[in-house]
From Swiss-Prot:
Protein keywords: ATP-binding, Ligase, Nucleotide-binding
UniProt catalytic activity: spermidine + citrate + ATP = N(8)-citryl-spermidine + AMP + diphosphate + H(+)
Pathway field: Siderophore biosynthesis; petrobactin biosynthesis
PANTHER family named in the record: L-2,3-DIAMINOPROPANOATE--CITRATE LIGASE (PTHR34384:SF5)
Gene name, Swiss-Prot/TrEMBL: asbA
Biotech and industrial use: The ability of the enzyme to catalyze condensation of citric acid with several di- and triamine analogs of spermidine suggests that it may be a versatile biocatalyst for the preparation of highly enantiomerically-enriched citrate derivatives via a novel type of desymmetrisation process.
Protein name: Spermidine-citrate ligase
EC number: 6.3.2.-
């Protein structure tokens, strides 16, 4: 097996280069070029590489070359181990390590984009991301059954993303966790930790709940049912009184104790720091949402860490957004659950925090439903965990599932893949597109927000999670308001249709569906073009329900190019997209494979 350092560096080049090619439109795919063959005859193994990438960096008069293992119709390609560069017209070439390749690419962007960029910050994040991938790979390389097994639990899947977002330039960059604490808080290292508790007088508490009990009652009840909590603690703190108990992530608790306003509350006697207690909760893929299979609820915390592009903070409007999403399902909009019984939401129906004027206090805690309680945790996996690249020498989890089913059913992997994909679209894509066209409600359904429950290897239930992930179309405002008064206004989730179209297309189609299709293709299970045709057919079936002024369907089915989130440029300009209105990431025009590949097949 390759060394963890080699694996991490190759994964880093691959994700960064795929972002660069997509977002800048650079790169040539060369299959027959004698001059290049002459240069690389002794460098590339001709029997394993029939396609080269040639990427010209004109501003520096440099050309990068790499071997292409798999060229993808959805534009996430697989590259070989070796990269080389050529200066000007010289016939000599030099081998390039990952730092050299990425330095060249960042320098080219710096020259082309000029002011307003932050190349040093980007380079730092790339290196740290690579170092984290190396650590995760080294620690988990023998843990293949949990990473890629036919059967896994919810938390095993959540903790399986060793490489992270496959089309992000810094998928595992984290700023704010000390290295020696990484194992405790990182899902990739099976992190788990006790929660730290604060006791707050009701005069400074802000809580809401759409459940039968208040948030305070729910949290105290969880502690009373925890065998790891002492009777003395329960007797002292878990009674019905004028105080609330707030669980806080350990990193956030440490940060809060250094804040002057928190120290003032403690001095005034309205706040008490109790410390850690109870069972250890496990880190999910988002780091800040913690889970335990014996807890009725997951807990989503503010978290003083910058992950990929953004600080992870529960904003006040997001607390309300969780309740709004839960309330929405009790209106006519909730008919989507009856019409598509394989589709469901993981809601955030309660929250608690401390009042600190009009801004966040840092005590924001979101109560999230936990459908993966006890034995229900079996075979529930986020989509990103199915298609995550495997450690060299292993298959992805999706590949292992399809191969096992093919063996059991005496069918080809292609036949099983096609059936699996069709079943999956029935419980995920179809209900979300229907809800969007019918009610103007879009979900930020990317791979990490999408959890699928499997039965005998096949998808039977889809769950959407994320209280930050609702968009409501302005054109449907009157209808939505009739269902739920003031929907989207307090939470800031109402947008013009063209904005919602763009976001919905990226998250549901580019990130989620194209990402899943790419996972089938890169694993050699089925040609991506076949699944793209299936996807297009399903989208076409919704044309009779098309809703103006939305152009969601028309552009997907007709436009050669579409707006796609540019993770590299967003990172390059150091944009914190979660702190900006309209989720102000940078979007660029990219090729639409639903048009391009269908045209090629025709």
């Amino acid at each position: 097996m390759k060394h963890a350092k080699q694996i991490a560096e190759h994964a880093t080049i691959q994700s960064f280069l795929n972002c660069y090619l997509r977002e800048t439109g650079s790169g040539e795919w060369i299959t027959e070029d004698k001059r290049i063959e002459d240069i690389f005859y002794h460098l590339f193994q001709r029997d394993t590489c029939s396609t080269y990438l040639c990427c010209r960096l004109s501003a520096q008069n440099i050309t990068l070359y790499g071997e292409v293992i798999y060229k993808s119709p959805t534009d996430r390609h697989l590259f070989g181990e070796q990269f080389y560069y050529q200066m000007g017209d010289s016939n000599s070439v030099m081998k390039a390590d990952y730092v050299t390749v990425i330095t060249f690419l960042i320098k080219e962007m710096s020259i082309n984009y000029g002011e307003g960029t932050n190349p040093a910050e980007l380079m730092l994040r790339v290196i740290r991301s690579c170092q984290n991938i190396e650590e995760f790979t080294k620690e988990r390389k023998e843990d293949t059954s949990a990473l890629y097994g036919f059967h896994t639990s919810f938390i095993e899947a959540e903790q399986s993303l060793l490489f992270g977002h496959l089309t992000h330039p810094t998928p595992k960059s984290r700023q704010g966790i000390l290295e020696w604490k990484s194992a405790m808080y990182s899902p990739e290292l099976k992190g788990e930790c006790q929660l730290h508790y604060f006791r707050a007088h009701k005069s400074i508490v802000n809580e809401k709940s759409l459940l039968l009990d208040s948030t305070t009652v729910i949290l105290k009840e969880e502690l009373r049912n925890d065998e790891m909590v002492s009777k003395e603690f329960i007797s002292k703190y878990c009674n019905e009184d004028e105080y609330s108990l707030l669980p806080i992530h350990p990193l956030q608790a440490e940060w809060l104790l250094h804040q002057p306003y928190v120290q003032d509350w403690i001095e005034q006697g309205v706040l008490e720091y109790i410390g850690p207690t109870g069972k250890c909760y496990m880190a999910t893929s988002s780091l800040r949402t913690l889970y335990h299979p014996d807890a009725k609820y997951m807990l989503k915390f503010s978290f003083p860490v910058k992950v990929t592009n953004s600080m992870r903070i529960n904003k006040l409007k997001e607390l309300e957004s969780g309740l709004e999403g839960k309330a929405m399902l009790n209106t006519a909009i909730g008919e989507v659950l009856e019409k598509f019984p394989g589709f469901d939401f993981i809601c955030d129906p309660a929250f608690i925090t401390l009042n600190y004027g009009t801004q966040e206090s840092g005590f924001e805690v979101i109560i999230r439903e936990n459908p993966f309680y006890s034995e229900h945790a079996d075979d529930a996996t986020l989509i990103a965990g199915l298609v995550q690249d495997a450690i060299p020498g292993e298959r992805t989890r999706l590949s292992n599932i399809i191969h096992r089913l093919a063996d059991l059913e005496s069918r080809s992997c292609e036949e099983v893949s096609l059936e699996w994909f069709r079943r999956y679209m029935n419980i995920s894509l179809k209900p979300m597109v229907w809800m969007y066209l019918q009610y103007g409600v879009a979900l930020e359904a990317h791979q990490q927000n999408s959890v699928v429950q499997l039965k005998d290897g096949y998808p039977v239930k889809y769950y959407f999670r994320d209280n930050q992930g609702f968009y409501f179309c302005n054109s449907m405002k009157e209808m939505l308001n009739n269902e739920l008064a003031g929907i989207g206004e307090r939470t800031g989730n109402l947008y013009d249709d063209y904005i919602v179209d763009e976001r919905f297309r990226y998250y549901l189609i580019f990130n989620h569906m194209f990402g899943l299709i790419n996972g089938f293709g890169t694993a050699g299970l089925i040609r991506e073009e076949i699944l793209l045709t299936e996807l297009r057919t399903v989208l076409e079936s919704f044309l009779p329900y098309n809703r103006e002024p939305s152009t969601f369907l028309r552009e997907l089915l007709e436009e050669d190019k579409l707006a796609c989130k540019a993770n590299l440029l967003t990172r390059f300009f150091d944009v914190d997209e979660l702190s900006n209105p309209l989720e102000q990431a940078i979007y660029v025009q990219v090729q639409n494979p639903l048009v391009r590949e269908v045209a090629v097949r025709s």
